[in-house]
Amino acid sequence: MDLFDCARSINKSHENDVLARLTTVWGEELDPEHVLEEYPRPQLKRDNFTILNGYWRYAITRSGDMPTTYDGTILVPFSPESILSGVERQLQPDEYLWYERGIFITAEDYASLSSKKLILHFGAVDQTALVCLNGRKVCTHTGGYLPFEADLTPFLREGCNSLSLRVRDASDASYHSRGKQTLKRGGMFYTAQSGIWQTVWMEWVPKNYIRKFYLTSDYDKGELHIRMLTHGTAPVRIQVFEESNCICDDSYKEPVPPKKKESSASALSAAKRNPEGYSLSAIIRIPKARPWTTEDPFLYTLKIQFGDDHVESYFAMRSFTVEPDEKGIPRFCLNHSPLFLHGVLDQGYWPDGLYTAPSDQAFVYDIRTMKELGFNMIRKHIKIEAARWYYHCDRLGIIVWQDMVSGGSSYSLPLVCYLPTLIPDISGHLKDNNYKLFGRSSKKGRNEWIKECLDTIDYLYNVPSIAVWVPFNEGWGQFDAGRITKLIRKKDKTRPIDQASGWFDQGGGDFKSVHNYFRKLDVVKDHRAFVLSEYGGYACRIEGHSSVERIYGYKKFSTKEEFSKAYRRLLDTELKPLIEKGLCAAVYTQLSDVEEEVNGLLTYDRKVCKPQ
C-alpha cells in the first residue's frame, strides 16, 4: 500500500473555490429555443405531447409565499447552479426556488375535457416540490431523483393558465437522498444542484388510459410477461415487432383469464380493481427469440392499444444470473453464459449542466466512447439518470449496474471511508444496525430511503440493460442491508444484488464487493461472485480542461503518456490475470473528471480522452 497516495486522497472541502467555466461542445451549441426536445420516456411513448423545456420565470425567496415579482428567466431543465441555466446561483436550505410559465388551452381542448385528461410530467425535481396551476395546489413531491406526474385537468381554464412550482432543497443538511451533492464541495463530493433538472412535458390522454406497465422477459421460456395498470377499462390490442415484422398481434374485446397451460400466442387476465385503477396481465410468446447481448443489443418493439390510448415501448430477451462455471467459481452470466464485466464508474456530472446532460447526443458520446475503450458495463454511481440515458444503453449494448442514491445525516468519513481503506478487514466486523454510526438515526429518513429504493426499482424495472441493483456504497447512509436485500429481491426476482459495494459487507447479496485503490489487486475467496466494484482512480490533470488547479485522485500522473502507460499496465498485468482466479467484474474509476477529481478517462468537458 502506498501510504503517501492514501494520505493525499483524504477528502477536503473547498467551497470557496471559483471553478473554471468549462463547457462541452453540446453546451456551446445549445439552442435555448430547442432544449432536449426528444420524447423523454422511450418505454412508454405517446404522440400527443408538448415539451415544456425552455425559459421559465424564476425567483429565489426567503418566504414560502408566492412571489409577486420574479428575478429573471431560467433555462429549464438546467438547475440554477449550472452555467447553462443562466442563473449560476446556489440555492440554500433556507431558501425557496420558484418557477412560473404559461400554458395555453385552446377552446377546442377545453370543450373536450370530459373525454380526455392533460397529464403534467416532471422527469426529476430536486428536492421537495409544490406544483400549482392558476394559484391552486395540484400536488407535492419529495425526492430529487424520481419522476412524478399530476393530472392538470380539474384546474384548467380556457386560454392562458399559470403553471408554478415551488422548490426547497436541503442538500446534505438533512437525511434526504443527495448522492455526491454537497454545499461544501471538494474532493470526491461535488457542487450541489437543485430544482428542475430533467425534462418537463405534458401530454393529452383519453379518459381511460394506460398508466404504466411492467415488462418481464422470460429468456428460458421465450416469453414476455406484461402487467399493465390503467385508469378505467377498454379493449386491448398488443403487437410485437421484430424489426418491421409483426410477430404477435392479439386483440381482446373482453379480457379473459389465462389458462395454466396456454398454447396460444398470448393470454390476458380479467381486469380487476386495484388502488391505482385496473390491472391486466398478459403472456406473449416470442417465437425463436433473438437474445440481447452487448455485441448484438436487439430490441423488440411493443405497441399497445388500450381503447383510444396508443403507446409504444420496447423490450429485450435476456437474463442476468450468477452461476458457477465448470470449476465451480461463481460468475456473472448473460443468458446463462459467463461474461466478465469490464466496467467503468459514471458519476453523471457535466461542467455546464451539472446533473443535466446538455443534449441527448452527449449521452450517446459517453456510452459509445466507453465501448470503444473496451468497456461492456457502466456503473451509474449513486444517481438515477434521465430515462433516455438508459434507452441508449439498451440500444447500444452496454450493461448497467445501478446504484441507489445515498442519503442519511452526516457520518464520519474517517471511520466510514478512510479506516476501511487502510484496514479492509475491520469493516466486515461492523454491523449496519448501528444507525448513528452510519448517519441513519432518523427512522423517518430510513423509511423515506426504503420507499425511494423500491420506487427506483419500480421506475427502472423495464430497462433491459440494468443487470444489478446496488443499494449501498461504502457505508454512506447504509442500514439493515440484509433486510433491504430481501425487500429488493421480493420486488425484483430477475436481477442479482450487490448488497454493499466497497466495505461493511453484511454477508448477503450475490457478490463479494470490494473497493481497492491502494493495495495490489487480488481476489477474495467467497461463496458469492467476487467483484472489484471500484479500483484505479488514476489522476491526470489536463491544463485548460480542469475546473481547478488542485488535483484529487488516487495516484497522480503528470502527462497523458505517463497516465496511458500506467493505465494499460494496470489492466494487463494486474487486472486481467485475476479473471481466471475468480474475478467476475471490475469497475474502473472513472468515466470523466468531475471538478477537482481528475481521475477520469475523459476530461470533465469531454474534449480530451486520456488513454492513448
Question: What annotation goes with each model-predicted range?
Answer:
Residues C132-V138, F241-E243, G307-D308, N335:
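Short strand-turn-strand beta-turns centered on an Asx-Gly dipeptide
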Residues R368, M377-K610:
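Substrate-binding/catalytic cleft of secreted carbohydrate-active enzymes
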Residues D5-R8, K12, A20, R57-S63, ...:
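Accessory beta-strand-rich segments of carbohydrate-active enzymes
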Residues D2-F49:
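N-terminal pre-domain segments of enzymes
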Residues F213-Y214, P291-T294, K303-M370:
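N-terminal carbohydrate-binding accessory modules
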Residues W56, G135, V200, Y300, ...:
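Conserved, mostly hydrophobic/aromatic
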Residues F122, L224-G232, H336:
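Aromatic/hydrophobic beta-strand junction motif of beta-rich domains
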Residues P154-C160, L229-D325:
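Extended acidic/polar, glycine-enriched regions
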